[in-house]
């Protein structure tokens, strides 16, 4: 009967019907059609007893519905069948996180990473547990809504999700050498497909924004600190003291994610060096790091558009801070990067300070 049911669902496609079934269940799960996903998974698990992948997905679906007893039953059974499966270990981590047991969640995250070092998803959960509060995109959206900037520039737009937060009447410019926008650019957005160095060499932001200074900037480009240093210097000259510059990826989770030769999807690079540099050599600036997942969000205020210190001393500053090893952060990383709590009341106070 189950074979007939599955064949009726998926037909003859030259692949095992259970593979099509699992694919359908995963799509339903991703679309939050959880009850439908469970019906398909029930049939699959009855048809193919002891199928760990189906048990993991059903456990994750039960977890999404808040049915934790059933979720743990499936995930425990899957774990017994596939103790070294990274996805299974990760879903167990998420389940424990949802129950508030961060210790067990972190243990399963570590096990998932050991099982598959290239599996980056557990890093996101580790970061969320470490920081708490809203993820950086939600914080960025709050900042846009609070500041209502007239002008906004974003360096490193990738798929354009954060650029979309700049809504009319904000004039927005996005810069990225290879933008991969998920949606067409909005009428109030202009996208320049070039490196930030090339953009600033060819364009005057004062002209681009019709004489209006930069109210808000978000630096999220190349994950090497010298690029972020130049981006900051180039943006600051078009700001006012009341402007705000945000810097992504400035609070690394650990040495591995802070490597200069890292790669997405979870890679902060050495942007942390820019925060240290600004705090040391530009004490006139108000520099803080919001502890928001996955890799922190720098917030810089009290900008000085007349300062040329960073550009005039670029090479020696790069040399000085490239020589600073990550181990320097081992003692009091929160203090050295001026970490502040990831709660909106704290962030709003920083945005209101002159």
Regions found by a protein language model. Give the residues of each.
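A short alpha-helical cap/connector motif
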Residues: 2-17, 21-39, 43-47, 57-64, ...
């Amino acid at each position: 009967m189950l074979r007939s049911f599955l064949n009726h669902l998926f037909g003859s496609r030259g692949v095992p019907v259970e593979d099509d079934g699992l694919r359908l269940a995963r799509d339903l799960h991703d679309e939050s059609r959880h009850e439908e996903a469970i019906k398909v998974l029930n049939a699959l698990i009855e048809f193919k007893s002891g199928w760990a992948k189906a048990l993991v997905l059903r456990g994750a679906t039960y977890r999404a519905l808040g049915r934790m007893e059933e979720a743990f039953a499936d995930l425990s059974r899957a774990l017994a069948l596939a103790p070294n499966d990274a996805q299974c270990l990760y879903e167990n981590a998420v389940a424990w996180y949802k129950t508030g047991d961060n210790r067990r969640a972190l243990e399963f995250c570590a096990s998932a990473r050991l099982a598959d070092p290239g599996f980056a998803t557990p890093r996101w959960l580790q970061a969320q547990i470490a920081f708490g509060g809203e993820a950086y995109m939600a914080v960025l959206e709050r900042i846009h809504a609070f500041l209502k900037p007239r002008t906004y520039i974003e360096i490193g737009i990738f798929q354009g999700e954060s650029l979309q937060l700049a809504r009319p009447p904000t004039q927005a410019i996005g810069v990225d050498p290879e933008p991969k926008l998920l949606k067409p650019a909005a009428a109030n957005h202009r996208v320049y497909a070039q490196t930030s160095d090339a953009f600033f060499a060819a364009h005057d932001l004062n002209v681009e924004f019709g004489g209006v200074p930069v109210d808000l900037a978000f630096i999220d480009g190349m994950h090497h600190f010298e690029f972020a240093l130049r981006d900051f210097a180039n943006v600051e000259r078009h700001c006012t003291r009341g402007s705000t510059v945000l810097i992504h990826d400035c609070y690394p989770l650990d040495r591995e994610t802070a490597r200069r030769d890292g790669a997405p999807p979870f890679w902060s690079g050495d942007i942390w060096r820019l925060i240290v540099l600004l705090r040391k050599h530009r004490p006139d600036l108000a520099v803080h790091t919001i502890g928001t997942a996955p890799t922190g969000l720098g917030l810089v205020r009290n900008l000085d558009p007349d300062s040329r210190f960073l550009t005039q001393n670029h090479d020696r500053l790069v040399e000085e801070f490239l020589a600073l090893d990550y181990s320097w952060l081992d003692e009091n990383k929160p203090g050295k990067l001026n970490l502040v709590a990831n709660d909106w009341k704290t962030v709003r106070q920083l945005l209101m300070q002159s």
